[in-house]
From Swiss-Prot:
It catalyses: (2R)-2-phosphoglycerate = phosphoenolpyruvate + H2O. GO terms for biological process: glycolytic process. Mg(2+) binds at residues 242, 285, 312. GO terms for cellular component: cell surface; extracellular region; phosphopyruvate hydratase complex. The gene is eno. NCBIfam families: eno (TIGR01060). Binds a second Mg(2+) ion via substrate during catalysis. This is Enolase. The lineage of its organism: Bacteria, Pseudomonadati, Planctomycetota, Planctomycetia, Pirellulales. The active site is at residues 205, 337. It comes from the Bacteria. It is found in: Cytoplasm; Secreted; Cell surface. GO terms for molecular function: magnesium ion binding; phosphopyruvate hydratase activity.
Length: 428
């Protein structure tokens, strides 16, 4: 039987050494599922609530024992006996139990851990891999990796404003070949940086965090690394950015502080458009502040026909904010982070709403991760076609890539790679 027998949570540590929630769900037929919850560094103000203990004497206030207790008492009691294969009902029960718009009462980290573990348990009970359980027999598209090879902003202790400089190996037929390409570029970039006298220490997401002279220098060294790895920029490999503009936007003045310049919204749009003219940039995430809808509209009008414009802090995996973007013609893609909204059901709802309206979706990690690889299965299950899960270092990032390699092997000849489809979309 797929009825929930028991739910247990514990406090574990994420990739930054901060506490996070891990949940285990056991069904009456003996099947079990486990999931761990990620955590972000640059978080949008509209995200679901991550419940921390706040006791500064323990883990500097970042403990999650309250969230763990909520799982082991209130949530466990409410869900016992429910059918794990009815994910929507399970998630709705937790939403109603919490009773707040942003899951502040129980904590989105408590609710999400259970939601993901329930999906894993149901998949195990039905003897299916998670991607097939969630996506059905037609789930066979491997996502193009957005490989974060230079970290800046909130993800690194350096002078680079842009949070992530990524490479996207799109011009390949198989995911495994694309992953090899990105990895080879990463290793070549290490030598390029070392030869220039820069540090090759890595940031939270496994990319290098050199103290470069400017954001543009980051683009230049990446172009050099692509060439030295033997690949062609703009034909096989493209560049993607996560500006995380909210982090350098002053709401009182309406100015963006970038490269030691104060820019208006119009100037920010022109600045990003200029980069797209000079470099093979295929995607820009959070190019504007999370609530600067006016500048977002201008950016979409200017370059949205040739560049993927991704809403992360803008949409926070929330169908209401995404619907506003759709209605107003703002952005053309949504970043999917399970902990921004807090349940598997709401995450899938956001992906499906995006796809119905011609928006792309990207399954994404957070800067604070664990060995949990749920987002890899989710990317294949929902045919997102793209995944953002860090660089070619740190085992918390490799866990997702390695899971995708296993899925590709399992699918065999049926496997598709999403890179060429996305390349066609941006090149026409």
């Amino acid at each position: 039987m797929t009825l929930i027998e028991s739910i247990h949570a514990r406090q574990i540590l994420d990739s930054r050494g901060n506490p996070t929630v891990e949940c285990e769900v056991t069904l009456m037929d003996g099947a079990a599922g486990r999931a761990a919850v990620p955590s972000g560094a640059s978080t949008g103000m509209h995200e679901a609530w991550e419940l921390r203990d706040g006791d500064k004497s323990v883990f500097m206030g970042k403990g999650v024992t309250t969230a763990v207790k909520n799982v082991n008492t209130k949530i466990a009691d409410a869900l016992e006996g429910m059918d794990a294969t009815d994910q929507a009902a399970v998630d709705q029960a937790m939403i109603e139990l919490d009773g707040t718009p942003n899951k502040k009462e129980l904590g989105a980290n408590a609710i999400l851990g259970v939601s993901l573990a329930v999906a894993h348990a149901a998949a195990a009970s039905t003897n299916q891999p998670l991607f097939r359980y969630l996506g059905g027999a037609g789930a066979r598209m491997l996502p193009a990796p957005m490989m974060n090879i230079i970290n800046g902003g909130e993800h690194a202790d350096n002078g680079v404003d842009i949070q992530e400089f990524m490479v996207m190996p799109l011009g390949f037929e198989r995911f495994s070949d694309a992953l090899r390409c990105g990895t080879e570029i990463f290793h070549n970039l290490k030598k390029v940086l070392s030869d220039k006298g820069y540090s090759t220490a890595v940031g939270d997401e496994g990319g290098f965090a050199p103290d470069l002279k400017s954001n543009q220098e980051a683009l230049d060294v990446i172009m050099t690394a692509i060439d030295k790895a033997g690949y062609k920029a703009g034909e096989q490999v493209w560049i993607a950015l996560d500006a995380a503009s909210t982090e350098f936007y002053d709401k009182s003045s309406g100015k963006y502080s970038l490269d030691n310049n104060q820019m208006s919204g119009d100037e920010m749009v022109d600045f990003l458009a200029g980069w797209c003219d000079k470099y093979p940039i295929c995607s820009i995430e959070d190019g504007c502040d999370e609530d600067d809808w006016e500048t977002w509209k201008k950016l979409t009008t200017k370059i949205g026909d040739k560049v993927q414009l991704v809403g992360d802090d803008l949409f926070v995996t929330n169908v209401e904010r995404l619907q506003r973007g759709i209605d107003e013609g703002i952005a053309n893609s949504i970043l999917i982070k399970v902990n921004q909204i807090g349940t598997m059901t709401e995450t899938i709802d956001a992906i499906q709403l995006a796809h119905r309206n011609g928006y792309t979706s990207i399954s994404s990690h957070r800067s604070g991760e664990t060995e949990d690889s749920t987002i890899a299965d989710l990317a294949v299950a929902m045919s997102t076609g793209q995944i953002k899960t860090g660089s070619a270092s740190r085992s918390d990032r490799m866990a997702k890539y390695n899971q995708l390699l296993r899925i590709e092997e399992l699918l065999g000849d049926a496997a598709q790679y999403g890179g060429p489809l996305f390349a066609k979309r941006i090149t026409g």
